[in-house]
């Protein structure tokens, strides 16, 4: 199951990128996936995303994402939702571009008041693009960044269990129950 990480933070070497890489590692371990992944860090493409015609770098990023079986999409929480940079990139994708993919939403946030943004905003975007989103998104508080290895495990286990139905040899892509779209976000730190 090839894994592609999409990071929608407008800053290079962001905390969002660090969290996404750690989350991808945790999912890879928990699900027993082959090591290796591609990362699309949108801050590198930012100046190209609003051009009328996509640059070769943007086309390559789109190709990586649309060819992926598993897409981990990470964004900081900005103004209560995912970044505009992430939205601009996904607006470039054709309708139903993620029809064959399983997506995992993740957001990094300053405070618990935004914990629901991952499933209230990012999950519907991924579902609109056709992705299966069978596991709860992860809302990571900045205050928990120092203990990522300890807190990613339970969530990665949930994701791994959800991915079992999508492994090669399983009888087709299952229909997602309504609960898969309404699952509460897994959140690190204090209760909401």
Features from the language model and the residues they span:
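Glycine-rich phosphate/pyrophosphate-binding loop and the adjoining helix
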Residues: 134-192
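Structured loop/turn residues at beta-strand edges in well-structured enzyme cores
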Residues: 66, 96-98
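Short, glycine-/small-residue-rich phosphate/pyrophosphate-handling segment
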Residues: 103-154
